[in-house]
Amino acid sequence: MTDWADPDALDLSDGETFDSLLDRADTREKGHFFEFFAEGDELAHDPGLRLTHHGSEQWMGQTLNHDPAYWRADTARERDFEERPVHPDYLLACVMGITVEDLSEKGGYFLGRDDVTFHQPVTAGTPLSVTSTVVDTKTSSSRPQYGIVTWETEGRDRETGETLVSYRRTNMIPRREPAATDGGAVGEQDEDGPMLPDTPISPDGEYFEDFQAALERADTENAAVAYRHERGRTMDDQLVAGLPLATLNTARQHHNRDEMADSPSGDIVAYGDVTRSVALAHARSDEATYRERRFADEQFHDFVTLGDTVYGFTRVLDCDPDAGPERAGAVTFEHVAFNQDQTPVYSGRRTALIQRDT
């Protein structure tokens, strides 16, 4: 009987031998299929990253988020931070990255995220602890090989237990066995096209009063406060593969071109939080941001692949002068990221505190 533990029993440098053995070998799988998840299940993810200024600065630099409060201690103090914090986009990506191996490493489509709330500023050196709870599972009527799962996730300080960020996220997840389906219904189309405001208005400046004045003007002119941002960012290897891996996001669709060659996208795709962060950077470059408050109704509409360029568009929805400290007011925006073909790839509502012009 052959001792297959003997190093000389197989010549794995021989192409035919290795190919035959590889075809017969089982694959030790990572991640979970749709059937694994049940409503009410709570998953405690492996200990996550200890947040760093280097990681935050790398994320900010690559995504064009240049707010000096996250780069400079003196500006952070002027903005009423006790210490220079890490950027909230970096925090959110690190919390979500930790969850990927347990929730969505099998692949599937990131459908959206809601109720994103930043509970307090977070500083470098904070160690993360992350849990997710399954809040809903259902069959996809359009793609029977997938199910749809929604989780509520909380990122905490592992040492103090304080909640740092929380959100609700929905993904398509591959099934072990496709579900029976009728294919779903097709919605009716409006042949007359969409109703649009007479005129889009842009704020005259970057402060809270500028957004408030623009909304007041729009109300009298049957107009909307809506504008595009000048900058664009082309997706390169660092954005598509490097940043997800730096936040422990192991989803194959961001770094395995072989696996993705026969997928609908035909290539590796950008991590949704990278696309989102680039779009938000474009928006933040045209405002005097004081603090991020919350995000809602975040959706990802199409693939973003290597070589695509992401641009930003913003609509101002509301201004609240009584929210926040005396030096800022709350503005609610709708942000849209779109590509070089003017195809929307991300949208979401965001409420931020914007500095007053004082």
UniProtKB/Swiss-Prot annotation:
User: Reaction(s) catalyzed by this protein?
Assistant: (2R,3S)-beta-methylmalyl-CoA = 2-methylfumaryl-CoA + H2O
Q: Which UniProt keywords apply?
A: Lyase
One GO term in the molecular function aspect is: lyase activity
Q: What class of enzyme is it?
A: lyase
Q: Which SUPFAM superfamilies would you find in this protein's record?
A: Thioesterase/thiol ester dehydrase-isomerase (SSF54637)
Disulfide bridge positions per record:
none
Positions of the MaoC-like domain: 44-148
Q: Short name of one Pfam family for this protein? A: MC_hydratase
User: What Enzyme Commission number(s) does the record list for this chain?
Assistant: 4.2.1.148
Q: Which domain of life is it from?
A: Archaea
InterPro entries documented for this protein: HotDog_dom_sf, MC_hydratase, MC_hydratase_acr, MCH/BMMD
Family, according to the entry, reads as follows:
Belongs to the enoyl-CoA hydratase/isomerase family.
What the protein does comes down to:
Involved in the methylaspartate cycle. Catalyzes the reversible hydration of mesaconyl-CoA (2-methylfumaryl-CoA) to yield beta-methylmalyl-CoA ((2R,3S)-beta-methylmalyl-CoA).
The protein's name is Mesaconyl-CoA hydratase
